[in-house]
């Protein structure tokens, strides 16, 4: 999975990683209509990348991975657990910091540097991204059924148990349910 930040936010992150601070804000520019009777418009610096599974669109992130017939509940539960872990880790470090502002600065720079490999503002459907993701060491899970085993890995179990979301037995059950649902849907489609 990659994340789309847009030119403006990507530039801020790049400044943080390279210099440790972000002093300049990239402007969106002007969208010229080419028609003398119409005004030119300010171009949004965040753009709209519709091929990204997780995109920043001005003032929010959009999560676009869930299929149209699927519930957002399970992915949201997972995202919330991941965010809770990140907040917990950040809070532990910041609460013990002697210089809070410097600790925030260092934490942002560290996170931006550590996770820079998931930022991709190009076409997420292209062969270029598949090659780039491989070069960056990112997994390329091509189907939902291939993603199911990630639900009950040691890392996933530890995350969900840490926050009291799911036990290992509950995650094992969810894996079984996902496989069963997939098999039923494939059988129905095969008979149609």
Where do the model's predicted regions map?
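Acidic, glycine-enriched catalytic cores built around paired aspartates
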Residues: 1-192
């Amino acid at each position: 999975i990659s994340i789309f930040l847009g030119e403006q936010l990507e530039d801020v992150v790049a400044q943080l990683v390279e210099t440790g601070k972000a002093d300049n804000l990239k402007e969106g520019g002007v969208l010229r209509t080419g028609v003398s009777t119409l005004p030119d418009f300010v171009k949004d610096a965040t753009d709209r990348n519709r091929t990204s599974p997780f995109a920043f669109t001005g003032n929010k992130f959009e999560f676009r991975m869930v299929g149209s017939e699927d519930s957002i509940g399970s992915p949201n539960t997972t995202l919330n657990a991941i965010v809770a872990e990140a907040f917990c880790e950040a809070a532990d470090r910041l609460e013990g910091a002697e210089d809070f502002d410097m600790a925030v600065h260092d934490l942002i720079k560290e996170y931006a540097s550590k996770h820079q490999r998931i930022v991709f503002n190009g076409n997420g459907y292209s062969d270029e991204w598949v090659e780039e993701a491989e070069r960056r060491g990112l997994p390329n899970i091509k189907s939902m059924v291939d993603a199911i085993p990630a639900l009950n890995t040691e890392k996933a179990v530890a995350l969900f148990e840490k926050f009291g979301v799911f036990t290992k037995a509950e995650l094992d059950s969810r894996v079984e349910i996902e496989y069963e649902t997939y098999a039923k849907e494939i059988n129905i489609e095969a008979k149609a």
